[in-house]
Amino acid sequence: MKKTILSLLALLSLAVGVNAQTTWNLDKVHSNVKFAVSHMVVSEVEGSFKIFDGNLVASKADLSDAKINFSVDVASVNTDNERRDGHLKSDDFFNAEKFPKMTFVGKSMKPLGNNKYKLTGDLTIRDVTKTVDFDVTYGGQINTGRGIKAGFKAKATIDRLQYGLKYAPALEAGGLAVGKDVEITVLVEMDQAK
């Protein structure tokens, strides 16, 4: 009887362990949030955000049930040009004073095979929320001896005009001075919570 109870307890603890949630916190030093947008139709301008945070919580090994939360401080925008950064913080674009954060809340993370995922979630900029799909590449996990790390690369393209980033002077030759489509690239390294 005692062996049966111990076996049952061992099985139960194994089952609980399999379904236990694992939390991953952002390693901000080894992560970045970048964007690129066309400029004057003929070139691109790149930039990044310096202040951001996020986490991922999942109980399945394939991360298909992952819950992802990410936020960016829009006033931390950096294009290596102070004047342009000031313009991006203005009401023509982010209006950082009134809308200091942009957020992403993941709704589903669908495994596609070969460490590829389709991450779908709600992106909110200037209090406008739209569903966005990110193409995600999972870099895997490694035990560093001080903890477990995981890496991800996520890419999406959004129409900035749909979010109220309204600066859109037309060029005489056609097109916009600043393109409407913005490529977002998020490179993250995450630490498994202990």
Located regions from the model:
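Bacterial Sec-dependent N-terminal signal peptides
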Residues: 1-23
